[in-house]
Amino acid sequence: MAKEKIIGIDLGTTNSVVSVIEGGQPIILENPEGQRTTPSVVAFKNSDIIVGGAAKRQAVTNPNVVQSIKSKMGTTSKVNLEGKDYSPEQISAEILRYMKNYAEAKLGQKVTKAVITVPAYFNDAQRKATKDAGTIAGLQVERIINEPTAAALAYGLDKQDKEETILVYDLGGGTFDVSILAIGGGSFDVIATSGNNKLGGDNFDEEIIKWLLGKIKAEYNIDLSKEKMALQRLKDEAEKAKINLSSQLEVEINLPFIAMNESGPISFATTLTRSEFNKITKHLVDLTIQPVKDALSAAKKTPSEINEVLLVGGSTRIPAVQELVKSLLNKEPNRSINPDEVVAMGAAVQGGVLAGEVTDILLLDVTPLSLGIETMGGVMTKLIERNTTIPAKRTQIFSTATDNQPAVDINVLQGERAMAADNKSLGQFQLTGIQPAPRGIPQIEVTFEIDANGIVSVSAKDKNTNEEKTITISNSGNLSEAEVERMIKEAQENAANDEAKKKNIELKNKAENYINIIETSLLQAGDKISAEQKEQSQKMIDEIKELVKNENYEALEQKMAELEQAMAAAAEFANKHNDSDSNNNSSEQNN
């Protein structure tokens, strides 16, 4: 029995593609119409569901046609088709099911597993919606990966040992994304992203349509901008013209019987040159400049530090786009893989790795939720942020909360809330043997480490005694997707309230710390500080203690500012007194 394949799917806004590993290399699977790309269009007709080119051809005549559903993924919006509401996940599932079915027909075996790509900017809700669409389609989604990572995987098959910085310029049908990746030793890491989710090939088509409408109106004084049938024909011709102008300097556009006037049917014909096309779409090409600059800035890279530029998306075939990329980055972009297919091929590579068909590529994963510990006042202090690429290691120094504290309790937390109690506790342990010392003096080094399998190790070490305690947690990833999503959503909904709580606790901790410092300083200062200043400081300390006790944080903040002024004055007085004593001692020694 043949080993089960894991297919790679580029679920695009305009078109979708499916690929699989054969003989260690990714190949594209053609759909039943013999096409390597499938329009991401779904039509409902008399309860029949039609996907792809056949659905696209009904866009004008059939009101129950859905296009560009990807832009709605992760939202609560619904699409009403033939009197019934459908979620974006359900519509996307029809596209995925269609691709799953024809992949099975091509491969001659059952397909139940897939890797699906998403834009790098997709949030958790959008990623989860994509995975849910796969589940509805009968697919076990093994991994959701970023489109630029997939593109780099496809290009990186033959250069796994090189360390490079790669810029992926992805201009698709409906969105534009630019990503910068660090590649080396078979690992791929996205270090910066930018883009415009309302810019793509469709916008170029619209400019040609506007140009054609203007030509027709000028010649025949007819406005076709509200005529659906005519607009669909114009859209089809505009798309063809755009594609042909990538390889030709001019194209003929023929629209027989496009309209009627008092003289009868009107047939329209014109020529669109590449020069004119560049002129009417220049503003669209220019809109890609700033995202490229933003990505370079975020990655802290200059164009000269980019080793390679990859073009992704059918719209990168436009010569003006290629010229812009070349001038922006001072290098010829790599166009060796079909830009419409490269993302699906990369997804197939990742599927091949998971299926054991491709080796020597490190799969990077990320932490779904932040990890940290409970600190004074019940605050969650994060050491590893959500979406950190693993393996990862972070270390931070903490201290004791009370004088002569003999031990510290480490409560390991997972979640996004500001308060420890609102997050999930993964485990607890105690570090003992801390030598007696005033609060804040002992140095406790806490280290979080996550290996490639997602196993978390947390250690606490007393830097004075080298006493160390470690806990290993293997269930940090055992939350269901629903739980992860719920925790993220709760954090977003409670962000303002949580931040206010955290701020108040930090203010309280700061107040108690200052009180401790002042009381210790007053004790040590003895007669070096005036009785009046002692009385003033003690009065303020008592007032602050009362405010802390009553949780009057607004007044506490004001008093803290006064306390800091008093501390500064006390320090200045003590320094002057010390200088005076020093001078007196010096004079006595000289006599």
Curated annotation (Swiss-Prot):
Family: Belongs to the heat shock protein 70 family.
Induction annotation: By stress conditions e.g. heat shock.
Low complexity: compositionally biased ranges: 581-591
Function text: Acts as a chaperone.
SS bonds (residue pairs): none
Keyword Ligase: no
Name by which UniProt lists this protein: Chaperone protein DnaK
InterPro entries: ATPase_NBD, Chaperone_DnaK, Heat_shock_70_CS, HSP70_peptide-bd_sf, Hsp_70_fam
Pfam families: HSP70
Chain positions found as Phosphothreonine: T175
Keywords: ATP-binding, Chaperone, Nucleotide-binding, Phosphoprotein, Stress response
Stretches the record annotates as Disordered: 570-591
Record GO terms (molecular function): ATP binding; ATP-dependent protein folding chaperone; unfolded protein binding
Lineage summary: Bacteria, Bacillati, Mycoplasmatota, Mollicutes, Mycoplasmataceae
Keyword Nucleotide-binding: yes
